[in-house]
Amino acid sequence: MIILGFESSCDETGVAAVCTQRGLLAHALHSQIAMHQEYGGVVPELASRDHIRRIVPLTREVLAQAGLRREDVGAVAYTAGPGLAGALLVGASVAQSLAWSLGLPAIAIHHLEGHLLSPLLADPRPEFPFVALLVSGGHTQLMRVDGVGRYVLLGETLDDAAGEAFDKSAKLMGLGYPGGPALSRLAEQGDASRFDLPRPMLHSGDLDFSFSGLKTAVLTRVKAATREGALDEQARADLAAATQAAIIEVLAAKSICALKQTGLKRLVVAGGVGANSLLRQRLAEVLPRMKATAYFPPLSLCTDNGAMIAFAAAERVKAGLANLEQGDHAFTVRPRWDLAELERG
């Protein structure tokens, strides 16, 4: 079966075609970063309008790339949440309309399940069970994954997500949007040892995270350096390096602890922060000593994208967990949706 997937939960419009037998056939993505830069963050109304402009041309592009006709598609999938309500409605409306017009089933997919399963698109593909570190702008969670639809929450952030810590710290340093990648680039020129920053909950004994205290510590350092007239470019680079080092140390340590507690030897890292080179380097150094392996999605699939949505739908179909009845195509979106609430069937 060929599944056409749509992602529009925030500021990326993604469309992809996935075959349940052959895998990813084609995908296309449009990022709204340039549009939102002048505002310093995502403007929901502008995001929704841009999704409307982009989603149909991207769909045509994917069908052309894969050499498909509309009649070749066997099902349609879309992100139903969590995300921005207006943005979600664009993708859901297009997906449901297309499914209705072609007489196809429409499969609602949890955005985080898309991220969670995206490393299965990599080669080699991790086998179940594994520990998953789901780390993005809005979420930081450790999950035990025993199969498609079989997820157990091990730990999560109690306040800010890791991606938020990157973005908010970058904003405090006067860096542009998106802040996380800008901070990571600047950190390459810095000395992390110049600033001593806290590692919140590093030794808490559980698998939860907290990054709000780190953000406060960065604010304190920025204010102090500004008062002293010492917040020059090198100081900002050093502070960026120290901030990144603190976040990555906590993420890596908690992931290692999760592997030890579960006895598993496979760690899957998913979400936008999974593209961070220091995180990849740190895990690549430490995990082999534990005879464990880290798996990452391809860099092009770390951000939000349609491929992960179409692929998650394909995995659900193969596992017998997707509702393939056409129904009346009435739908809702869920801006807030805990992955633990996800039904298996």
From Swiss-Prot:
Its gene is tsaD
Assigned keywords, A-Z? Acyltransferase, Cytoplasm, Iron, Metal-binding, Transferase, tRNA processing
Reaction catalysis annotation: L-threonylcarbamoyladenylate + adenosine(37) in tRNA = N(6)-L-threonylcarbamoyladenosine(37) in tRNA + AMP + H(+)
EC number(s) recorded for this UniProt protein: 2.3.1.234
Q: What is this protein called?
A: tRNA N6-adenosine threonylcarbamoyltransferase
Give the record's cofactor note, including how many are bound.
Binds 1 Fe(2+) ion per subunit.
Please state which protein family the record places this protein in: Belongs to the KAE1 / TsaD family.
A Pfam family the protein falls into? TsaD
Query: Where is substrate annotated to bind?
Result: L134, V135, S136, G137, G138, D167, G180, N276
Q: Which residues bind Fe cation?
A: H111, H115, D304
> Top-level EC class, please?
transferase
